[in-house]
Amino acid sequence: MIVIQLLIAASLILWIRFLWSRRKLYMLMMQLPGRMGLPLLGNSVRYLIISRGRMSSRTTYMDKHGSTYMAWIGTTPIVITRDPKIAEKVLTSPFCINRSSQTTNALALSMGYGLLTLQGSKWMARRKHMNPAFKHSVLLSFLPIFNAETDLLVSVFDSFVGQGEKDVLSDLIRWSFAIATQTTLGTDVTKDDNFENDAILKTYQSMLRLTIINIFVPFVQNKIVSKLFGLEWLRRRDASAINKMINNILDKKLNSNPENYCESELKTVIHRAIELFRNDEMSLMELGAECSSMVLAAFETSAHTVYYALVLLAMFPEHQEMVFNEIKEHFPLAKGIEVTHTDLQQLVYLDRVLNETLRLMPSVPFSSRETLEDLRLSNGVVIPKGMTISIDIFNTQRNTDYWGSEAAQFNPENFLPEKIHDRHPYAFIPFSKGKRNCIGWRYGLMSSKLALVKILRNYKLKTSFPYENLEFVDHMVIKLAQSPQLAFERRTL
């Protein structure tokens, strides 16, 4: 009897200690709106199954309850906000340098520990080491690859002329994947059989799907649960295929003379990583993870950015004509275009269209951080240490308090210089911002803008899909519930 009483007392003490350790969390729950989730599952089931991951469900909730609220992903509480003031506080804070543990663990299962998944001082050291691979002169050396691969894409689109509306997203993904792999791993990657038959591309896409499951349903990160649902076998299969390809490339490069490569080849991510490996600043496993994660992060984001810009211009032909006239002024002839960085800098209206596309359809819809210390937000709310704060980029960039009553409408005039000057700097953060912004944002803009120049100089685009019917779905890269198809008409000038 005494033993039972002691066990009950001990259990009660542990339970009280547990509740006391979470007292700041419970205080936060009283300050912010939000609904309790299901045990173990949180709000994920409701969001993924009932709302089917529709971004509009978050928008509706914020419109009703305010720009900042609490949710539960599994057993993890998370603060979600679309307030630019809070976004600035979080993204510039030295106590919010780490991505959320939940997101990091999900990404690490897919791609190992590289720049996207490292935390704290390890991330800062790696970022410093990898910055030279993304400096301006290196990006300029990639222009021949951008031009060559976009010419191949244009030739594919040429076969679509007069054929009615076609799915173009899959071709854009192939284009972006070809660019991402060559600028990361070197141009010889295209000689791999798995590259030519799209096998490795499909493997990367499968890995992305598994990653989003691991983020939104975190209990499947457990290997036992993952095996039970058959996900562990898929993860190992995909990881094995990707590692095999990258290791084959690494073996060749590690055993070859650097003098055998041209200057642009030596500036790729893989050669920068090899340099760090030879200086004992990176392990062989980290080298492979860095290369894999760079490809994974780059190819779908650029493809979707170009796709969404083309879709919007097809839906709004008056803006498409303005872009075409600007491009035609710089490139009177459609054939044989070799786009330079100087050319890209002069296309001001195209810049506005691209920025407006990134505002309405940011490639990555959210950016999550974990607090290293208690953090007081601009609204006076204190976020406890160890809490995840997710910046809802999609809804931040459609926040009517900063973008006006027409925030959901396509309007490139939003990026006139005077309007940019008067707007909160964190109301537009398509590549995140602050201390841990996207290392490849200039790369993404340059490759996307160049592709738009060549496509729009050659073709007039049309679609029967109305703008009002676009429905956005949460994913690693923002997706559409139904993807509009495009019709191509060759420009005669």
Swiss-Prot record:
**KW Cytoplasm (keyword) present:** no
Is Iron-sulfur found in the keyword set?
A: no
**Enzyme class, UniProt record, top EC level:** oxidoreductase
Q: Which PROSITE patterns match?
A: CYTOCHROME_P450
What's one Pfam family here?
A: p450
Classify the protein's membrane topology as the record does: Peripheral membrane protein
Entry GO MF terms? heme binding; iron ion binding; monooxygenase activity; oxidoreductase activity, acting on paired donors, with incorporation or reduction of molecular oxygen
- Cellular location of this protein? Endoplasmic reticulum membrane; Microsome membrane
Q: Which domain of life is it from?
A: Eukaryota
- Keyword list, A-Z: Endoplasmic reticulum, Heme, Iron, Membrane, Metal-binding, Microsome, Monooxygenase, Oxidoreductase
Swiss-Prot/TrEMBL cofactor(s): heme
Q: For binding heme, which residues are annotated in this chain's numbering?
A: 438
User: What Enzyme Commission number(s) appear in the record?
Assistant: 1.14.-.-
Record-level GO cellular component terms: endoplasmic reticulum membrane
Q: What does this protein do?
A: May be involved in the metabolism of insect hormones and in the breakdown of synthetic insecticides.
Spell out the family assignment given in the record's similarity comment: Belongs to the cytochrome P450 family.
Name by which UniProt lists this protein:
Probable cytochrome P450 313a2
* Gene name linked to the record: Cyp313a2
